Swiss-Prot record:
Gene3D superfamilies named among the record's database cross-references: Ribosomal protein L33
PROSITE patterns documented for this protein: RIBOSOMAL_L33
Protein name: Large ribosomal subunit protein bL33c
Record keyword Chloroplast present: yes
Top-level taxon of the source organism: Eukaryota
SUPFAM superfamilies for the chain: Zn-binding ribosomal proteins
GO biological process, one term: translation
Length: 64
């Protein structure tokens, strides 16, 4: 049986370099992934590659 509240949720990670405006192309790049609420209750910050900025930047979890 499934539990009432799912442990894994889908989150979006947004590039911080794109949101500050120092990039070559217009737009903001976002990754979609899942996280476990019990293991990581706080917001996630990962270093991922951004094709708009052409480098690895910090991507932060955003609200949906």
């Amino acid at each position: 049986m499934a539990k009432a509240k799912d442990v894994r949720i889908t989150i979006s990670l947004e590039c911080t370099g794109c949101s500050q405006g120092n990039k070559k192309y217009p737009g903001v790049f976002r990754y979609t992934t899942q996280k476990n609420r019990r293991n990581t209750p706080t917001r996630i910050e990962l270093k991922k590659f951004c094709p708009y900025c052409y480098r690895r930047t910090i991507c932060r979890e955003i609200k949906k």
